[in-house]
Amino acid sequence: MHHELQTLADPGAVARAGAAFVAEHARAAVAASGSFHFAVSGGHTPWAMFAELASQAVPWEATVIYQVDERVAPPGDPDRNLTHLTKALGPAPAQVRPMPVNDSDLVAAAASYAALLPEYFDLVHLVLAPTGTPPRLYRAIRSCRSPIAWSLSPSRTRGGCG
């Protein structure tokens, strides 16, 4: 696999390049297997990319988007990552698999969500925040020697996988 480091002029250029990258991988995955399984991170960083992605030539009818991070808040709440994801994508007809963070039994909800996940994702989008996330992520990747297990975060204010 070829890796390339790009330096882009501004956040808008990053959003456009990210959207083009996702769209290209979506088309390739659908051509190869008939579907595109895309895991997306939370936070505000990817919102502009998702807005750009909505206008790209993406095979939306074959695209399934999975959340890997969510806050426990009512549907439509501005603290919810899902609120911003669906707003940014607009009318794009992708199938979005929201995390069931408002269920009364979050352990059962996490197990239910895990059952929906594909064995492999075609693409995983992660946000590396300036708050120290990159070093933790890199340590986790280096130490990962077995398949990732999906789990509920111990915090009742955020859901996630790890």
What do the predicted segments below correspond to?
Residues 1-38:
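N-terminal glycine-/serine-/threonine-rich phosphate-binding loop
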Residues 9, 13-14, 73-162:
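Conserved phosphate- and dinucleotide-binding cores of soluble alpha/beta proteins
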Residues 40-45, 126-130:
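Glycine-rich beta-strand-to-loop/alpha-helix junction loops that act as flexible
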Residues 44-46, 71-72:
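Short active-site-proximal "capping" loops at secondary-structure junctions
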Residues 49-57:
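Histidine-anchored nucleotide/phosphate-binding helix
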Residues 56-61, 91-92:
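Short helix-capping segments at alpha-helix termini
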Residues 62-63, 121:
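Local beta-strand N-terminus motif with an aromatic residue
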Residues 64-69:
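Short internal beta-strands
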